[in-house]
């Protein structure tokens, strides 16, 4: 079976924009004669919609978007992740819709909800109670959300698709490769894992959608921190021939993630410029370098705010950094403002020895100005 794997950068709450991306990928896949196209968990709503899921009009809009997407699937089948409200019973599932012949014909619900870190799915969703394979072109397609549902894999399954979204950590790609290789060998099945790519405020998705053959060998890996589109043939996965992205060391990977996350966050929120304080220290230097790489040095303003505690060396280091990066910079002396704070607080501080409380007023002053 020819399967299209689009790896897309969705936006939380942007149902129309996400749907347009999905439809565009479907049209591309149909033009390339793909038989099935895969989209991850909550592709229509965007990852982490959170309290938007408490608004019935939002969930209904997601359902209408799924129907609009289905209408474009005239020559291809699709698996699309979206919230699914059972209005009759007043419950909602995290579902994978199966689309064929221009309409939704089947689907599965996520059975093991994620409730860790930033995930609180049981607050919004009800867990599904079973998992039945999708029947398509005389093949049984098992749709799972993550490896915790692997107990549903059956010997009659033709291949397995994981549509769960995997947040980025420095070790997430390595761990995912290990898990998929182990499961592929254990169950003797070809496995496909499709992921989100993009930033969601405090969470980053790195893409890295993967395909493993039944021998536990990686057959395909999509790009990290970038949209991508790949076609695979499940009949030709026995001997992997597809090129995969070159792995990087941890520092290089973290650097790439930070630059991508900053750039994507600014783009999604309509920001173009940033103002950063430059102290001459390593912390502000690293932040400035990352911001300049992500946004362009001309879009990052460096603000030097020396005080009576600033050394000439730190001021010169901050100036050298700004000039080396090529970023515009300004200097605002904060001594006068700092002294006004001290004067205002003197009635409270007069009987106390001078300590870090007074020194830290300079940090508060800088924060106010930035």
Which positions does each model-derived feature cover?
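A generic structural signal for residues located within well-ordered alpha-helices
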Residues: 17, 250, 357, 361-365
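Short glycine/serine/threonine-rich phosphate/pyrophosphate-binding segments
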Residues: 284-287, 311-312
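Conserved glycosyltransferase catalytic-site signature
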Residues: 177, 364-367
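Enzyme catalytic cores with a strong preference for nitrogen-chemistry domains
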Residues: 1-277, 290-297, 304, 324, ...
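A conserved beta-strand->alpha-helix junction
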Residues: 112, 226-233, 299-304, 312-355, ...
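A glycine-rich phosphate-binding loop feature that marks nucleotide/adenosyl-phosphate handling sites
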Residues: 271-284, 337-338
